Amino acid sequence: MNSRDAIKVGLDMADFVGKGYLGDLTDAELLHRPAKGANHINWQLGHLIVSEHQIIESVAPGSMPALPAGFAAKYTKETASVDDPAQLLTKEELLKVHDAQRAATLAALAKLVDADLDRESPEAIRSYAPNWANAYSLQGSHWLMHAGQWAVVRRQLGRPPLF
C-alpha cells in the first residue's frame, strides 16, 4: 500500500460511517438541530460538499465537476440558520452531489504519485492543509468530524447507535 492508497482508505471509511449515520434519516430529520446555534445535518452536508470542491479544485485545478447552479450560495456561513426545506436540497440530492465530488477527488488522487503529496498547497488553504497530503486527507477527517455530530442527532431522534 502506498500513501495514496492509505488516503483512499480514509476517504472510503469516512463515506461508510457518514452514509451509515445518514441512511435512515429523513429530510425533515436532517433539519434537526442538536443544540441552540448548532448546524443541522442538511447544512453540514452542503458545507462538506462545497469545502471538498474548493479544496481539491485548489490543488488540482479542473479536476472537480461544477457544483449545481446556486449550490454554494445555499450553504454558506450566512445560510447556516436556514431551516426552510424549500431553500435547501434534499438528502438524495445532496448525496448525489457528494458522490460526484468524491469520485472526482478519488480520480484526482489516483493520478498523483506519492511525491506529489509533499507539494505545498495554495496559500488560501495552507494554514490548515500545508501540503497536498493534508488537502486530500482532510476530506475524510472533515466528514468524520461532522459525522460525530450526526451520531448525537441520531440518539436525540431515538435511533440506536450504529458503530
Range-by-range predicted roles:
Residues 77-119, 134-139:
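Acidic/histidine-rich alpha-helical segments that form the ligand environment
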Residues 8-12, 16-19, 29-78, 122-163:
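Short, contiguous alpha-helical
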Residues 1-5:
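Basic/polar N-terminal segments that are highly enriched at the extreme N-terminus
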Residues 11, 15-18, 22, 98, ...:
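Hydrophobic alpha-helical core bundles mediating ligand binding, dimerization, or RNAP-core interactions
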Residues 26, 110-113, 154:
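A structural signal for long alpha-helical coiled-coils and helix-turn connectors
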